[in-house]
Amino acid sequence: MLSPVPVDAVELAEVPDVMPDAMPDDQLMLAYAGGDTGAFDVLYARHEGALFRFVRRLLGIRLAAEVDEVFQETWVRIITARDSFSPQGAAWRTWAFTIAHNLAMDRLRASGRQMVVHVHDDDDEGLDAVQRVSGRLLNGQGQPVDAAHPSAEDAAFWRSAGRRLLACLNELPDDQRAAFLLHHEDGFTVEAMAAALDVGFETVRSRLRYGLKKLRGCMARYLSVLVEGA
Protein backbone atom coordinates (compact mmCIF):
# COMPACT_ATOMS: atom_id res chain seq x y z
CA MET A 1 0.00 0.00 0.00
CA LEU A 2 1.27 3.42 -0.90
CA SER A 3 1.79 5.89 1.90
CA PRO A 4 3.26 9.40 1.96
CA VAL A 5 6.99 9.06 1.38
CA PRO A 6 9.11 10.81 4.03
CA VAL A 7 11.91 13.02 2.83
CA ASP A 8 15.00 14.01 4.76
CA ALA A 9 14.23 17.68 4.44
CA VAL A 10 11.73 19.77 2.57
CA GLU A 11 12.91 23.13 1.44
CA LEU A 12 9.94 25.41 1.78
CA ALA A 13 9.43 27.30 -1.43
CA GLU A 14 8.90 30.99 -1.20
CA VAL A 15 5.18 31.61 -1.24
CA PRO A 16 4.05 34.42 -3.52
CA ASP A 17 2.43 37.39 -1.86
CA VAL A 18 -1.10 36.41 -2.86
CA MET A 19 -4.29 35.72 -0.97
CA PRO A 20 -4.43 32.12 0.37
CA ASP A 21 -7.71 31.46 -1.45
CA ALA A 22 -5.89 31.96 -4.76
CA MET A 23 -2.89 29.77 -3.93
CA PRO A 24 -2.47 26.27 -5.42
CA ASP A 25 -2.84 23.32 -3.07
CA ASP A 26 0.87 22.49 -3.08
CA GLN A 27 1.85 26.00 -2.03
CA LEU A 28 -0.81 26.01 0.68
CA MET A 29 0.60 22.79 2.13
CA LEU A 30 4.14 24.18 2.10
CA ALA A 31 2.91 27.35 3.78
CA TYR A 32 1.14 25.27 6.42
CA ALA A 33 4.29 23.21 7.01
CA GLY A 34 6.07 26.54 7.51
CA GLY A 35 3.65 27.56 10.26
CA ASP A 36 0.79 29.28 8.43
CA THR A 37 -2.30 27.69 9.98
CA GLY A 38 -4.54 29.81 7.80
CA ALA A 39 -3.24 27.93 4.78
CA PHE A 40 -4.56 24.70 6.27
CA ASP A 41 -7.98 26.28 6.77
CA VAL A 42 -8.11 27.06 3.05
CA LEU A 43 -7.07 23.51 2.12
CA TYR A 44 -9.69 22.03 4.41
CA ALA A 45 -12.49 24.25 3.10
CA ARG A 46 -11.46 23.55 -0.49
CA HIS A 47 -11.39 19.74 -0.24
CA GLU A 48 -13.57 18.82 2.74
CA GLY A 49 -16.66 17.99 0.68
CA ALA A 50 -14.93 15.93 -2.01
CA LEU A 51 -12.87 13.92 0.49
CA PHE A 52 -15.88 13.21 2.69
CA ARG A 53 -17.97 12.13 -0.30
CA PHE A 54 -15.17 9.84 -1.53
CA VAL A 55 -14.74 8.18 1.88
CA ARG A 56 -18.49 7.79 2.33
CA ARG A 57 -19.07 6.15 -1.04
CA LEU A 58 -15.97 3.98 -0.85
CA LEU A 59 -16.89 2.59 2.57
CA GLY A 60 -20.44 2.04 1.35
CA ILE A 61 -23.53 1.05 3.25
CA ARG A 62 -22.00 -1.65 5.40
CA LEU A 63 -19.47 0.73 6.99
CA ALA A 64 -21.52 3.93 6.91
CA ALA A 65 -21.14 4.33 10.67
CA GLU A 66 -17.35 4.61 10.29
CA VAL A 67 -17.27 7.33 7.64
CA ASP A 68 -16.74 10.23 10.06
CA GLU A 69 -13.91 8.43 11.83
CA VAL A 70 -12.04 7.60 8.60
CA PHE A 71 -12.61 11.13 7.28
CA GLN A 72 -11.20 12.69 10.45
CA GLU A 73 -8.28 10.25 10.48
CA THR A 74 -7.48 11.29 6.92
CA TRP A 75 -7.05 14.89 8.00
CA VAL A 76 -5.04 13.86 11.05
CA ARG A 77 -2.65 11.99 8.75
CA ILE A 78 -2.42 15.03 6.48
CA ILE A 79 -1.59 17.22 9.46
CA THR A 80 1.01 14.90 10.95
CA ALA A 81 2.65 14.31 7.56
CA ARG A 82 2.85 17.99 6.64
CA ASP A 83 6.65 18.06 6.92
CA SER A 84 7.03 15.04 4.63
CA PHE A 85 4.92 16.43 1.80
CA SER A 86 7.01 17.19 -1.27
CA PRO A 87 5.63 19.03 -4.32
CA GLN A 88 8.15 17.09 -6.41
CA GLY A 89 6.09 13.97 -5.75
CA ALA A 90 2.36 13.62 -6.27
CA ALA A 91 0.18 16.71 -6.35
CA TRP A 92 -1.35 17.54 -2.98
CA ARG A 93 -4.84 16.47 -4.04
CA THR A 94 -3.60 13.10 -5.28
CA TRP A 95 -1.55 12.69 -2.10
CA ALA A 96 -4.54 13.49 0.14
CA PHE A 97 -6.93 11.20 -1.72
CA THR A 98 -4.34 8.42 -1.55
CA ILE A 99 -4.29 8.75 2.23
CA ALA A 100 -8.11 8.60 2.33
CA HIS A 101 -8.14 5.63 -0.04
CA ASN A 102 -5.60 3.66 1.99
CA LEU A 103 -7.38 4.28 5.29
CA ALA A 104 -10.77 3.33 3.84
CA MET A 105 -9.41 0.18 2.19
CA ASP A 106 -7.75 -0.84 5.47
CA ARG A 107 -11.12 -0.46 7.19
CA LEU A 108 -12.89 -2.47 4.48
CA ARG A 109 -10.37 -5.30 4.73
CA ALA A 110 -10.63 -5.36 8.51
CA SER A 111 -14.43 -5.47 8.35
CA GLY A 112 -14.50 -8.79 6.51
CA ARG A 113 -17.27 -7.27 4.37
CA GLN A 114 -19.78 -7.71 7.17
CA MET A 115 -22.89 -5.59 6.94
CA VAL A 116 -23.22 -2.82 9.50
CA VAL A 117 -26.71 -2.10 10.82
CA HIS A 118 -26.56 1.67 10.34
CA VAL A 119 -27.61 2.63 6.80
CA HIS A 120 -27.69 6.01 5.08
CA ASP A 121 -30.97 6.71 3.31
CA ASP A 122 -30.24 10.08 1.80
CA ASP A 123 -32.07 11.05 -1.38
CA ASP A 124 -29.81 14.06 -1.89
CA GLU A 125 -26.73 11.84 -1.68
CA GLY A 126 -28.10 9.52 -4.33
CA LEU A 127 -29.22 12.37 -6.57
CA ASP A 128 -25.77 13.95 -6.33
CA ALA A 129 -24.13 10.64 -7.26
CA VAL A 130 -26.29 10.01 -10.30
CA GLN A 131 -25.87 13.59 -11.51
CA ARG A 132 -22.10 13.19 -11.43
CA VAL A 133 -21.85 9.93 -13.35
CA SER A 134 -25.01 9.59 -15.46
CA GLY A 135 -23.27 10.77 -18.63
CA ARG A 136 -20.57 8.15 -18.28
CA LEU A 137 -23.07 5.37 -17.60
CA LEU A 138 -25.08 6.34 -20.69
CA ASN A 139 -21.95 6.32 -22.87
CA GLY A 140 -23.34 8.86 -25.31
CA GLN A 141 -26.86 7.41 -25.42
CA GLY A 142 -29.79 9.20 -23.88
CA GLN A 143 -29.70 12.40 -21.87
CA PRO A 144 -27.59 12.81 -18.70
CA VAL A 145 -29.14 14.25 -15.57
CA ASP A 146 -30.05 17.93 -15.64
CA ALA A 147 -31.67 18.62 -12.29
CA ALA A 148 -31.75 22.41 -12.60
CA HIS A 149 -35.53 22.56 -13.00
CA PRO A 150 -36.93 19.01 -12.81
CA SER A 151 -40.62 18.25 -12.84
CA ALA A 152 -42.02 16.37 -9.85
CA GLU A 153 -42.03 13.19 -11.95
CA ASP A 154 -38.42 13.67 -13.04
CA ALA A 155 -37.30 14.44 -9.50
CA ALA A 156 -38.89 11.25 -8.21
CA PHE A 157 -37.26 9.23 -11.00
CA TRP A 158 -33.80 10.64 -10.32
CA ARG A 159 -34.05 10.14 -6.57
CA SER A 160 -34.98 6.52 -7.18
CA ALA A 161 -32.14 6.16 -9.70
CA GLY A 162 -29.75 7.74 -7.22
CA ARG A 163 -30.68 5.28 -4.48
CA ARG A 164 -30.18 2.45 -6.95
CA LEU A 165 -26.78 3.78 -8.02
CA LEU A 166 -25.55 3.93 -4.42
CA ALA A 167 -26.72 0.34 -3.92
CA CYS A 168 -24.98 -0.71 -7.16
CA LEU A 169 -21.75 0.99 -6.09
CA ASN A 170 -21.93 -0.87 -2.81
CA GLU A 171 -22.08 -4.19 -4.70
CA LEU A 172 -18.85 -3.56 -6.62
CA PRO A 173 -15.60 -5.12 -5.42
CA ASP A 174 -13.77 -2.58 -3.27
CA ASP A 175 -10.94 -1.94 -5.74
CA GLN A 176 -13.36 -1.39 -8.65
CA ARG A 177 -15.50 0.96 -6.58
CA ALA A 178 -12.44 2.97 -5.54
CA ALA A 179 -11.24 3.24 -9.15
CA PHE A 180 -14.68 4.29 -10.40
CA LEU A 181 -15.07 6.98 -7.73
CA LEU A 182 -11.58 8.41 -8.18
CA HIS A 183 -11.88 8.55 -11.97
CA HIS A 184 -15.51 9.36 -12.71
CA GLU A 185 -16.44 11.43 -9.66
CA ASP A 186 -13.19 13.08 -8.63
CA GLY A 187 -11.52 13.45 -12.01
CA PHE A 188 -8.28 11.54 -11.50
CA THR A 189 -6.54 10.36 -14.65
CA VAL A 190 -5.66 6.69 -15.08
CA GLU A 191 -1.98 7.63 -14.90
CA ALA A 192 -2.41 9.50 -11.61
CA MET A 193 -4.44 6.65 -10.12
CA ALA A 194 -1.84 4.06 -11.11
CA ALA A 195 0.92 6.10 -9.47
CA ALA A 196 -1.10 6.90 -6.35
CA LEU A 197 -2.37 3.36 -5.80
CA ASP A 198 0.98 1.80 -6.76
CA VAL A 199 -0.57 -0.52 -9.36
CA GLY A 200 -0.07 -0.90 -13.10
CA PHE A 201 -1.76 1.30 -15.70
CA GLU A 202 -3.56 -1.69 -17.23
CA THR A 203 -4.71 -2.82 -13.79
CA VAL A 204 -6.43 0.51 -13.24
CA ARG A 205 -7.99 0.39 -16.72
CA SER A 206 -9.25 -3.12 -16.04
CA ARG A 207 -10.82 -2.09 -12.74
CA LEU A 208 -12.53 0.84 -14.43
CA ARG A 209 -13.76 -1.25 -17.35
CA TYR A 210 -15.21 -4.05 -15.25
CA GLY A 211 -16.65 -1.70 -12.66
CA LEU A 212 -18.41 0.39 -15.29
CA LYS A 213 -19.76 -2.73 -16.99
CA LYS A 214 -21.22 -4.00 -13.72
CA LEU A 215 -22.75 -0.62 -12.90
CA ARG A 216 -24.41 -0.40 -16.31
CA GLY A 217 -25.88 -3.85 -15.83
CA CYS A 218 -27.05 -3.00 -12.34
CA MET A 219 -28.59 0.29 -13.54
CA ALA A 220 -30.03 -1.15 -16.78
CA ARG A 221 -33.68 -0.51 -15.91
CA TYR A 222 -33.05 3.20 -15.32
CA LEU A 223 -30.66 3.64 -18.23
CA SER A 224 -33.15 2.08 -20.66
CA VAL A 225 -35.73 4.71 -19.69
CA LEU A 226 -33.27 7.47 -20.55
CA VAL A 227 -32.28 5.92 -23.87
CA GLU A 228 -35.91 5.39 -24.89
CA GLY A 229 -36.82 8.95 -23.92
CA ALA A 230 -33.89 10.56 -25.74
Regions of interest found by a model, annotated:
Residues 29, 40-44, 54, 71, ...:
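Amphipathic alpha-helical segments enriched in hydrophobic/aromatic and basic residues
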Residues 33-34, 57-62, 73-90, 110-111:
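Sigma70-family region 2
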Residues 44-45, 52, 63-81, 186:
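Conserved RNAP core-binding helix
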Residues 51, 55, 82, 96, ...:
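Hydrophobic-face residues of short alpha-helical interaction/recognition segments
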Residues 69-76, 90-102:
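Structural recognition of an alpha-helix C-terminal capping motif at a helix-to-coil junction
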